[in-house]
Amino acid sequence: MKAVVYKKPFEVAVETVDDPKIKHPNDVIVKITSSCICGSDLHMYEGRTAAEPGIVFGHENMGVIEEIGSAVKTLSVGDRVVMPFNVACGFCKNCQRGYTGFCTTVNPGFAGGAYGYVAMGPWVGGQAEYMQVPFADFNCLPLPKGDQFEADFSLLADIFPTGYHGAELADVSPGESVAVFGAGPVGLMAAYSSVI
């Protein structure tokens, strides 16, 4: 398959890489239809984070399930899904407490995992044609079939939930005024989340 591969600071290339495979019964393979470029990807691209050459970027992904592992219970081939940026198991102590960004199962030697990001586990990113998603019942959010609202739904992978979480942590209540400093994509979603 084709994928965006990091070479060195300020250099990426579209290259042929190995197709992902089902490695565990709870995996799915997703044909990627959208993958956003995050500021975190730019940290690696610009050399501000020590990324190893060969990493495939992309932790804001959505697509259609092409293949399914034998233990997957809530998803089917053909389901349109978006994957949150962090990889989590859903059953460890941290996941059970809602701290999925600090999952202790998905990344040997470090709490927390993400697709296509340095030191965040073995998970290949989604700036590619296909992607393996582990613990798929937990890591795939099913969407309506079709291709309507593709750009809108892609925000569910990282940008919108990050902004929403900020508004939630601020304990915003109806009628309150809110100031957002740094109104880039995530800041705009925090402002929007304060309205809803």
Enumerate the predicted regions with their spans.
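Nucleotide donor/acceptor-binding cores
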Residues: M1, N26, G175-E176
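A short beta-strand micro-motif
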Residues: A3-Y6
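Residue-level recognition of beta-strand termini and adjacent short loop/turns
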Residues: K8-F10, H24
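Short glycine/threonine/proline-enriched tight-turn/helix- or strand-capping micro-motif at secondary-structure
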Residues: E11-D19
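Glycine-rich beta-strand-centered segment in the early N-terminal region that forms part
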Residues: D18-S35, E46-Q96, G101, W123-V124, ...
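Cysteine-cluster motifs in flexible loop/terminal segments that predominantly coordinate metals
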Residues: C38, P84-A151
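Cytochrome P450 core scaffold surrounding the K-helix E-X-X-R motif
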Residues: S40-Y45
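Mid-domain Rossmann-like dinucleotide-binding core that forms the NAD(H)/NADP(H) cofactor-binding site
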Residues: R80, P142, D147-I196
